[in-house]
């Protein structure tokens, strides 16, 4: 296929090839080689023990943090899915019920996977190589996010975008085709520290760095015994904690509701057998099942 230079803007290219970008998805690109490398940043967190006992991208930082993974790749397409539009922010639950954090209400990686498969199918027809990374321990998913112009890293350590805030998940697709990198944009949290103020355990006391040893979300996914000082802060949370997300001003584009949040009956959960529990919440990260 003969491609004119102006078509190498990825959005123009997809439009010309009748590939629709789904609702709530934003995309951008970076050139490869990118010379982007976050390996040392990951190692620093690990050396300071702030990763707690998480594996994931900490298992092999030299690879997961490396931007230029493939000599054949000419670009990486970054896909951001805004799941914040699906459910409004709620802040209450009923007595005897357990709250599920907004990021875990559903498997929000599904739309990213579906769109990336569509892109891969297209590039396959051109005999162009691709490699995707979606929620993978082999790739630091936010590696190219800032360089692509989609947003910035907030003081909560989450990736933020204007009007979306932290309510997004990220996928990456390396492609054997050269797309132009957008002009760099300058974003910042400025003097805002709402995420730090809202964190119930002080896991964000050092801005831009999360101490997983204090993070409720980490402990609710850990097979270890939860420390007493964390237990007293968990309250009625069943899975996850998103206080740092709900407090983030760029993500507050909807009214906060006092209605019940997504919740589960804790008594039923306790009496549910393993197979039914996994079936009901198959997208949850469960230690020893997911590795």
Where are these regions (language model features)?
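Short alpha-helical interface patches
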Residues: 35-47, 139-143, 147, 212-220, ...
